[in-house]
Amino acid sequence: MSEIEQLKKQVEAQGGVVRQLKADKADKAAIDEQVKVLLSLKDKLRIASGEPASGSKSAKSFSLKTPKGTKDYTAKEMSVRSKIFSTITSVFEKHGAVTIDTPVFELKEILTGKYGEDSKLIYDLKDQGGEECSLRYDLTVPFARHVAMNGISNVKRFQIAKVYRRDQPAMTKGRMREFYQCDYDIAGQYDAMIPDAECVRVAVEVLTSLDVGSFVIKINHRKILDAIFEVSGVPEDKIRTISSAVDKLDKLPWADVKKEMTEEKGLDESVADKIGEYVRLSGREELLDKLRALPELMASSKAQEGVADMDLFFKYAKIYNILDYVSFDMSLARGLDYYTGIIYEAVLTEENVRPTEAQPTATGAKEVKEGGEIDESQVRVGSIAAGGRYDELVGMFSAARRGGKAKGKNSNVPCVGISFGVERIYSIVMSRLPAETIKANKTQVALKIATELWDAGIPAEFTYKVKPRLQSQYNTCDQEVIPWAVLIGSDEVASGNVKIKNMAVKVEGEEGGVTVKRSDMISELKQRLGL
C-alpha cells in the first residue's frame, strides 16, 4: 500500500473518530484535540500528493465554491423567487400587516434558551468589541425583543429575511444553513383564538396562491400536550425534552421515538406507553369530544383550557372557510421552548410527494453518505410553514430589561404567528418545472415570455404548473381583472408565434386570440395597451 493510500485511510478513520465524539456530545477539549490530529493528517496527505499544506503561503489554489448549506441563484431562479416573495407579501399586506427589519445578528443572551434542543444549531460569532453575538436562528425571537425594547402594545407585522442554522444541509429539498423565512405575527391583547385562526387563514391563502399542491395544516395545543405529559407521569424537568422527542413523530415511527424517550432521556417505559396512547390520536373537531371523554386528562386545568381554545378555533376556522385544510394532530409538538398555546404546521400530503423522491429508510432515519453528509435523495421537503402562540416571550424580555421584574402595561404582550419556509416552497415550485432540455418546451417559453414582458415594463404573471388548464387561467384573468393574455401551445412553440387575446372585451373575429410573431409580441402588446 502506498503512502498516499495509507494517509487516506488514516484521514478517513480519524474523521470517523471526530464524528463519533460530536455525536456523543463529548467534551469540547477532547473534540478539539482529535480535530487537530485530523487536520495534521490532511496536511500530510496534501504534501504527499504534491499539494502545499493548508497553512502554506505558497498555496496558489483554493476551493472555489459556496460554503456548505448555501448557494447562488441565477437571474432566472431569482425571477421565480421574486414571484414567491411578492405573492406572500401581497397576502400579508391584504391582512393589514406592516413590515419591519431587525439585525441579522443579536446578542447571544437574547437567543439563548429559546429553542430547546435546537439551540446547538445557533451560529456563534467571535467576540468583537466586548459583546457576545450570534446569527439569528429565526425571526420570532428578534421580533419579541423588538416589541419589548420599544414598548409596543399591539402590532400586526411581517418580515422577510435570512436566518442561519448549523443544520445538516439537504439543498435539493430546501434544507440549508442560510435561508429565508417569511414571518407574519399578531401582537397584542385580543379575544381568544381570533388572531390564531387568522394566522392559519393567512397560511391557507399563501399556500393556495403559490399553488404548492395538496397540503394539510396540522394543529395542536401546548397546554393539552403538557397535560398529557403530566397525567402520564413525566417529571417536570423532562417535559420539554420529551416534547422534543414527540415532535419527531412526523419523521420517525413510534418505536424509535419511544426508544429515544426511554433509553436516551431516561423515561420509564410505562410512562412512554401512556404518552403513546394519546399522541397517536388525530382527527378534526370530533377529537375534542374524545378528549372530553377522558376523565383523567380533563381533570387537568391545562387540558380544560386547551380544549376550550381548540373549540373556539374550530368555530372560527369554519367562519374563515379553512376547516377542510385543518387536521387536529396530537403528535404535533413543535420543539421550540417559547410556544404556550396553539401550534400548527403545514405539510404536503403524501400524494403530493414526487414519485422520483426516495422515501425515508425503514427506521425513518436519513441515509448518511461516507464522510458524514446526509444523502439528499433520502430527504423529503417536510413542513413548508409553521408557527403558534407565544404569550410569554415578550414578557421574558421585558422582565430582563427591568431587572427581573415584569411591570407595566406592555410587560407581557401576547403574540401569535406563522413562518413560511421559502427555500422549501421554492424547491416545490422548481421541482414542477421539467429538467432543462435542448429543445424548448412550453414551460420554458412561458418563462422567457414573462421575462421579456417584465423587461419591457409590462406587468405580467404566469402559472407555475407544467400542464395548466386553460380555463382555470381564463378564470384567474376574470377574477384579477387581467385585460390581456399571451397564449402558447405546441403549435406556437414550433412556429415561433404567440397568440394575444383580449380578456376584457370580446372582439369579433378574435375570439381565440390574434396570432403574431414572437419578435413582434412586445410592439403589438404596447400598441394594444396604448403604451
Where are the regions that the model predicts?
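Short, charge/polar-rich alpha-helical segments
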Residues: 1-8
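Auxiliary tRNA-acceptor-end handling modules of aminoacyl-tRNA synthetases
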Residues: 8-80, 126, 235, 251, ...
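TRNA-binding/sensing appendages of the translation machinery
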Residues: 47-144, 149, 177-180, 192, ...
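Positively charged, Gly/Ser-enriched RNA/tRNA-binding surfaces
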Residues: 80-95, 106-109, 139-151, 155, ...
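Acidic, His- and aromatic-enriched active-site or binding-groove loops in soluble protein domains
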Residues: 120-128, 233-262, 348-352
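Retroelement reverse transcriptase polymerase core
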Residues: 208, 227, 233-237
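Glycine-rich, mobile lid/loop segments that gate access to catalytic sites or pores
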Residues: 217-228
